[in-house]
From Swiss-Prot:
The lineage of its organism: Eukaryota, Viridiplantae, Streptophyta, Embryophyta, Tracheophyta. It comes from the Eukaryota. It holds the Pfam family FBA_1. Residues 2-47 form the F-box domain. This is F-box protein At5g41490.
Length: 387
């Protein structure tokens, strides 16, 4: 008599299901109640995440397009690097038009063409949470969104309390009429809170904060200075306040780089990319933190190169410390989209992402590691309970 898969021991079922590609987990959960419960268990989640994050030589990324998000892997080597699309991630519906995405340890904060709300999504678990904004985010005359954003969480014992930070520290189109605003949304309480940050005197030069170990980081410059970017500043999601500015590496700032971008390295370190806009525009440096605490940071140089007119300033970048490889996304050859892969030996490979013409979001790529973080559903309000 043949044995049905549903009659197998639970540990065998967990092992089998853990081999299912992440993009197909929604179908697994819908198969039966038992499989749905298994897929949500802590043991199974750790098993599948370990399998997804230890594929040899591959970096998992999400390609962002207006109506869909696609999971892909990038195999990095100095002979034949390649990109492989794993398939489209199931979102809410094709009518949801995505404008921008922020990644935080497996959670995606998705901004829509509908400027009145955002949605936080865990592609691994399929959980979503819609958040209504207090007011739309593009307030400037040009409709450019000058708000800064970050998604993060506070550790509360065995669980994590997800929070969404949104602030406006400078409006360059109206320098004489500055109306700063700092607010945070708590997923546990389902409430927005206005933060008292009246003495904040640093201007962030990136719209999206990079999350690392409970804090979100931005490159900044003194609001009263016209100097180059020489510090980073962080927001502590537990204390719900900004910490002191931390210096960028002097070895880079003394060269007068005018462009700085940040990235997270394996959820453990920060990487900083430096490049000139005009002079020495083909030279760039990347530094990585060796230690980062509340009031101090130390850096180590990862890479410095001059590649001539081969690469443009990357919108997003990633590094592989073990392989000494830099991956940067450029948009110079629009409508085509490329990842530049650069190694320590100064080799350069361009990988065409084959993004359909006219489909563009910012950032167009984000790194991805599956996460078991639970997105709490909003509590029923009194009027909802009465229905």
């Amino acid at each position: 008599m043949a044995t049905m898969i549903t009659n197998l021991r639970r540990d065998l079922i967990e092992e089998i299901i853990s081999r299912v590609p992440l993009r197909s987990m929604k179908a697994v959960r819908l198969t039966c109640k038992s499989w749905n419960n298994i897929s949500k268990s802590e043991i199974f989640t750790k098993m599948q995440i370990d399998k997804a994050t230890t594929r040899e030589g591959k970096t998992m990324m999400i390609s962002v397009m207006p109506h869909n998000l696609s999971l892909m892997s990038v195999a990095v080597d100095d002979v034949d690097p390649s990109v492989e699309f794993k398939g489209q991630l199931s979102f809410l519906c094709n009518q949801v038009s995505i404008h921008k995405v922020i990644h935080c340890e497996g959670l995606l904060l998705c901004f829509l063409k509908d400027h009145t709300r955002v949605v936080v999504w865990n592609p691994y678990s399929g959980q979503t949470r819609w958040v209504k904004l207090r007011y739309p985010h593009p307030p400037s005359p040009s409709k450019w969104d000058w708000f800064r954003y970050a998604l993060g969480y506070e550790d509360k014992g065995s669980c994590r309390s997800v929070k969404f930070l949104r602030f406006l520290d400078y409006l360059p189109e109206e320098p004489e009429n500055q109306n700063v605003c700092y607010e945070i949304y708590d997923f546990d309480s389902d409430l927005w809170t206005t933060l008292d940050v009246t003495s904040h005197s640093w201007i962030c030069y990136s719209s999206c904060g990079v999350f690392l170990k409970g804090n979100a980081y931005w490159p900044v410059v003194k609001s009263s200075s016209e100097a180059n970017i020489d510090h980073i500043i962080y927001f502590d999601f537990t204390r719900e306040s900004f910490g002191p500015p931390l210096p960028l590496p002097f070895g880079a700032t003394d060269r007068g780089y005018s462009y700085v971008n940040l990235s997270c390295v394996k959820e453990e370190k920060l990487a900083a990319f430096f490049q000139h806009y005009i002079s020495y525009k083909y030279e760039f440096e990347i530094w990585v933190t060796t230690k980062i605490e509340a009031e101090m940071v130390s850096w180590s140089k990862f890479l410095r190169m001059d590649l001539g007119p081969n690469i443009d300033i990357p919108i997003t970048f990633f590094i592989d410390e073990e392989k000494k490889v830099f991956m940067g996304f450029e948009h110079r050859e629009y409508p085509k989209r490329f990842i530049n892969i650069i190694g320590e030996a100064k080799y350069l490979r361009k990988l065409d992402l084959q993004v359909p013409q006219g489909q563009y979001c910012c950032p167009p790529l984000c790194s991805y590691v599956p996460s078991s973080i639970q997105i709490k559903k909003p509590a029923l309000r009194q009027k909802d309970r009465a229905k």
